[in-house]
């Protein structure tokens, strides 16, 4: 039985996605749940699935994809370039299947930035960019508020570097980051630190090393050891592109 958990807001993109899931996902005669993000009653619904040991999938915007418009209402701008992630039993893809280069080549031909190009040739970075996940994700995954996570991260970073720490939160209408481009903050950036933010992709695609949680989507190609923030041990190009191909 395919169960798509509906969001009441009629503009939510899930209403477009669920019709495709309900039509095309094989029904194996047991409850299989689908949740769009963490809105509505989804957090409680996911907890119930875990308690009942019922299969569930978390659906949200894709990792390597053309971006959607979010405000004032979400819109898919280009269906051919837009992908969504469907993660089994997790908010993020932690285990992937290595694909042939064909998929990445297809994305690149569509004009999507999908290729790891290497690391900076020199150490010209000046600041650390701190990019927390949303308050909801931070609380669910780290068990503390976003503000608490930011303060903990700042204290830890300051133990090992005296570089400026620059905060960048998710751009939302009315906040200071609304209408800005993360690429501007990545200029002269030494490293990006996050818990689960997809800003890790932006950094890696722009030659910047990343420190992130082990169970984040980019955990396999990022570091946890803040002690090494001045002298990162960066992964090699084939390994990072292989990870991109899994997503």
Question: What does each of the following model-derived ranges do?
Answer:
Residues 1-44, 136-137:
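N-terminal pre-catalytic "stem/leader" segment of glycosyltransferase-like enzymes
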Residues 9-10, 38-41, 62-65, 133-137, ...:
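Short, solvent-exposed loop/turn segments at secondary-structure junctions
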Residues 11, 73-125, 221-247:
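Leloir-type glycosyltransferase catalytic cores
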Residues 26, 158-211, 215-216:
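Donor nucleotide-activated moiety binding/catalytic core segment of transferases
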Residues 26-60, 188-195:
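Short, well-ordered secondary-structure micro-motifs within conserved domains or adaptor modules
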Residues 55-57, 63, 165, 210:
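Hydrophobic beta-strand scaffold residues
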Residues 66-74:
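Phosphate/adenylate-binding glycine loop and adjacent helical scaffold
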């Amino acid at each position: 039985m395919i169960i798509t958990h509906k969001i009441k807001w009629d503009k939510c993109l899930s209403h477009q996605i669920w019709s495709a899931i309900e039509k095309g996902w094989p029904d194996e005669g047991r409850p299989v749940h689908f949740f769009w993000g963490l809105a509505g009653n989804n957090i409680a619904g996911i907890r119930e699935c875990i308690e009942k040991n019922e299969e569930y999938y978390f659906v949200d915007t894709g990792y390597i994809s053309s971006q959607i418009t979010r405000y004032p209402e979400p819109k898919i701008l280009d269906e051919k370039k837009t992908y969504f992630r469907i993660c089994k039993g997790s908010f993020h893809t932690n285990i992937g299947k290595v694909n042939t280069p064909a998929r990445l080549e297809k994305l690149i031909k569509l004009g999507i930035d999908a290729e790891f190009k290497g690391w900076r040739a020199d150490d010209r970075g000046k600041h650390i960019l701190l990019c927390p996940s949303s308050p909801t994700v931070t609380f669910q995954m780290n068990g503390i508020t976003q503000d608490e996570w930011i303060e903990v991260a700042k204290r830890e970073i300051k133990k090992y570097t005296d570089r400026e720490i620059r905060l960048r939160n998710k751009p939302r209408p009315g906040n200071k980051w609304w209408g800005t481009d993360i690429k501007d903050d990545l200029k002269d950036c030494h490293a990006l630190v996050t818990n689960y933010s997809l800003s890790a992709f932006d950094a890696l695609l722009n030659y910047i090393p990343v420190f992130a949680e082990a169970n984040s989507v980019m955990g396999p190609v990022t570091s946890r050891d803040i002690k090494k923030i001045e002298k990162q041990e960066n992964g090699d190009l084939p390994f990072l592109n292989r990870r991109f191909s899994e997503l």
